Amino acid sequence: MTIQGLIPATLTPFNSAGAIDHLALSKHITSVGAATGLYGIAVNGHAGEILALNDDERQAVIATARSAMPPGLKLIAGIEASSIDGLVRQGLRARDAGADMLLVIPPFDVRVYRHLSHNVEAVFHVFQRLDKEVALPMIVFQYPEPSGCAYSLDALERIAALDHVVAIKASSGTPAKYAELHDRLANKLALLPAADSPSLLGMLLHGAPGSLIGISVIGTQQWSDLVFEATRGNAQRAKEIHNNFAVPLMRSIFEYHMHWTATCPFGATKEALVQMGEFSSSWVRPPSVLVSDDKKIEIRKGLLQAGLLKE
């Protein structure tokens, strides 16, 4: 299975009552999907606030996205649970709602389970059940080491042998950690850099086939161009797009993943789309923190520097 190109991780818009705005979601999927050079579109990831959605809402998001998907693109649905049975149920519901692929959020991101992410058999058991019982292509979400639940290389190599494990969302943190993954696993599955920070460029230039990132819903075509140039070795052109377009957004919206403020980065992403006229609200569900007035000003500056707004 060849995976090549950008996969934007989309947002979940809410209305004034805090319910999912399915009309706005449909428009969001259509808008993002209009860019060229995409492999697919992801829903129900962290950017889509999966942790704030109940099971029925998660399935409804997938169904809405399915109906709005442009032809030729894969619909990738995030699944999340802290039990294997829960993950399987999520996977089956995602499949029933029309997902083509799954993004498997680590079930080990719970204090008492984190050490198990290094245990080959524990990790294999999770993905073996998904492989057999859901039987959809899977993207494994690899967290950075400081999370405490990054999968060991041995565990990743073991699950790469499963028929339906086709890619890793490599939220590795640094180009060096991405290179370590690449050296061990690039001949077995697709390694998709996932960084809404300047470390992305180095990962893309290290033989990546594509990328899966949330920030790319802002000016999706430019992000797709960045991925295209970098993955084809056009380093100078990729650097120009990265420095002139991507970095101002990485700084103002995702704060280089340094968390300088308590602002939810996905709320900040929504606010950018509000300022661009694509969203009507930047509201996020608690406990996420809403975008402050000062942050809105900072986001506007980033959009201006990236050329997405004019004075």
Located regions from the model:
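C-terminal alpha-helical cap/extension of soluble enzyme domains
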Residues: 2, 7-10, 31-38, 205, ...
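Active-site beta->alpha loop and helix N-cap motifs at the rims of alpha/beta catalytic domains
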Residues: 2-150, 309
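Alpha-helical structural signal in soluble globular domains
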Residues: 35, 60, 64-68, 93, ...
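A general structural signal for well-ordered alpha-helical segments in protein cores
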Residues: 62, 87, 127, 178, ...
